[in-house]
């Protein structure tokens, strides 16, 4: 955390890092001086919060002069200043956040490598010209380079966890509905979640489950923010964050599930070996490792890439040069024919990947495709959620526990307990199927092939579950992530256990 002298040091660091930022391209906007938190509204006997440096993904709205919100898109110019401030920005500034800038991303959060940006791709420093992951690649690089203590990202299908894995840091996606999305430019409303990136888990624990924990705060501006009554019900079913969960740091007695379906053919052998080694280390530390089955996993990625583009096509319809978006002058001068203004503005303002997903989403919502694609994808989503509920020992506090027959499970599933599937505390799997690829290779890759990077992160997003990526050791140079997934609203215990797991698997 920053003192006054630390704030002066942060100012000097901003200046010294300018050339590096140009090289790595991880910031879109960075003011000449860090922006300190606002002064308290009135004299108070309570001490001022400790300050910390914060980078903000540029699809999270800020009203601070000099910090426009661009979403890394040509359709929103750097002159656009949001009329509203995101709730999470207000909350963190009240807790001492010193904002150092807005970070680069895939346009509107659509991508897995932070290459689909109007301002150019994001690159890692070590190794050079390597993908930083996406879509929160800029935030991840800012943390990995030590420029900030904490960075904000958004996680729709893995956009915080994947960059964390590629850059060797912590990436945390809270339970859906815990953190307000108000002021976050939407990609897919039912999936978008504000996420956090850091080198340490303790700052995340302090923010989420500390004395002023964000888990307590309902935001009436966000219809997806869990109500105060629902938060109390969730906490009561978990027997209280601090009394039961917040104290558990030892691994002994915990049961981790290894999803059989995650051992896919596309999994890099080096990642597979690191996954097995991590499981062995946890077992040596007293944890129990058991196989579990999530049979709908094989359909999760396809369902995600139907649901998310469908929601995106609706959300981005307002960027037409009239209500939102920079109007194309050429199209405006020749707007006699119907739709010319819209077509010109959207055609020139949106990047190729965004246009690809808008077209895909518009088709799946059409009358001829709705039943075959969108409705079926929603059914898959319910099955994914059911699979998770079956394997976790804790119940989902927002759903009734479901009973089922053993005949529902595939014949090939092996179970230690023939009375039913193993019930586990957490699931353990890789965050990404490969190490971070070179940017050149990514840019030469077919766009649809890059969607495979989300195969391990998408299921938790579809179910709205908390998940965290921690660095794990691999045989060669490079970074890899180990993902822990918890039951809904089990965030406090997930953060505590992830802290213990990270210490075991980091070296």
Swiss-Prot record:
Listed EC numbers: 6.3.5.7
Positions with biased composition (Pro residues): 31-46
Source species, domain of life: Eukaryota
Protein's UniProt keywords contain RNA-binding: no
Region (Disordered), start-end ranges: 29-51
EC top class, as a word: ligase
GO BP: glutaminyl-tRNAGln biosynthesis via transamidation; mitochondrial translation
Record keyword Nucleotide-binding present: yes
A GO cellular component annotation in the UniProt record: mitochondrion
Subcellular location: Mitochondrion
Active site: 57, 135, 159
MF-aspect GO terms: ATP binding; glutaminyl-tRNA synthase (glutamine-hydrolyzing) activity
Subunit structure of this chain's protein: Subunit of the heterotrimeric GatCAB amidotransferase (AdT) complex, composed of A, B and C subunits.
Function: Allows the formation of correctly charged Gln-tRNA(Gln) through the transamidation of misacylated Glu-tRNA(Gln) in the mitochondria. The reaction takes place in the presence of glutamine and ATP through an activated gamma-phospho-Glu-tRNA(Gln).
Record-stated family: Belongs to the amidase family. GatA subfamily.
Protein name: Glutamyl-tRNA(Gln) amidotransferase subunit A, mitochondrial
Lineage of source species: Eukaryota, Fungi, Dikarya, Ascomycota, Pezizomycotina
């Amino acid at each position: 955390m920053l003192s006054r002298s630390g704030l002066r040091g942060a100012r000097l660091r901003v200046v010294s890092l300018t050339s590096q930022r140009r090289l790595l391209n991880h910031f879109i906007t960075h003011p000449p001086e860090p922006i300190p938190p606002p002064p308290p509204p009135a004299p108070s006997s309570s001490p001022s919060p400790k300050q910390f440096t914060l980078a903000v993904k540029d699809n999270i709205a800020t009203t601070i002069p000099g910090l426009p919100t661009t979403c890394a898109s040509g359709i929103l110019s750097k002159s656009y200043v949001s009329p509203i401030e995101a709730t999470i920005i207000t909350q963190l500034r009240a807790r001492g956040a010193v904002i150092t800038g807005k970070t680069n991303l895939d346009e509107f959060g659509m991508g897995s490598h932070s290459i689909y940006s109007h301002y150019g791709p994001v690159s890692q420093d070590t190794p050079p010209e390597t993908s930083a992951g996406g879509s929160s690649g800029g935030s991840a690089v800012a943390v990995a380079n030590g420029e900030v203590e904490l960075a904000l990202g958004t996680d729709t299908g893995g956009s915080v966890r994947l960059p964390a894995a590629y850059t060797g840091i912590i990436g945390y996606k809270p339970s859906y509905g815990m953190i307000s999305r108000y002021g976050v430019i939407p990609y897919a409303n039912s999936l978008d979640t504000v996420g956090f990136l850091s080198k340490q888990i303790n700052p995340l624990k302090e923010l989420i489950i500390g004395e002023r924990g964000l888990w307590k705060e309902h935001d009436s501006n966000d219809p997806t923010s869990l109500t105060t009554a629902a938060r109390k019900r969730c906490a009561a079913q978990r027997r209280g964050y601090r009394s039961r969960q917040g104290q558990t740091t030892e691994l002994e007695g915990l049961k981790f599930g290894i999803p059989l379906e995650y051992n896919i053919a596309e999994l890099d052998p080096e990642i597979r070996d690191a996954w097995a080694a991590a499981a062995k280390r946890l077992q040596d530390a007293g944890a129990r490792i058991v196989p579990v089955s999530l049979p709908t996993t094989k359909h999760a990625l396809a369902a995600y890439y139907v649901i998310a583009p469908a929601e995106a096509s609706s959300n981005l319809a307002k960027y037409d040069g009239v209500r939102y978006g920079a109007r194309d002058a050429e199209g405006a001068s020749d707007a006699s024919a119907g739709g010319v203004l819209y077509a010109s503005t959207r055609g020139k303002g949106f990047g190729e990947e965004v246009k690809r997903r808008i077209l895909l989403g518009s088709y799946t919502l059409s009358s001829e495709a709705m039943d075959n694609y969108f409705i079926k994808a929603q059914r898959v989503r319910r099955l994914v959620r059911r699979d998770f509920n079956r394997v976790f020992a804790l119940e989902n506090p927002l759903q009734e526990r479901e009973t089922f027959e053993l005949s529902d499970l595939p014949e090939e599933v092996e179970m230690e307990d023939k009375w039913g599937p193993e019930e586990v505390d957490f699931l353990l799997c890789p965050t990404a199927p490969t190490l971070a690829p070179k940017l050149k290779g990514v840019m030469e890759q077919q766009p649809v092939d890059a969607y495979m990077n989300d195969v391990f992160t998408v299921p938790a997003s579809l179910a709205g579950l908390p998940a965290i990526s921690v660095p794990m050791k691999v045989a060669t140079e490079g970074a890899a992530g180990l993902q822990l997934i918890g039951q809904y609203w089990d965030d406090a215990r997930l953060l505590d256990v992830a802290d213990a797991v990270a210490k075991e698997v980091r070296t």
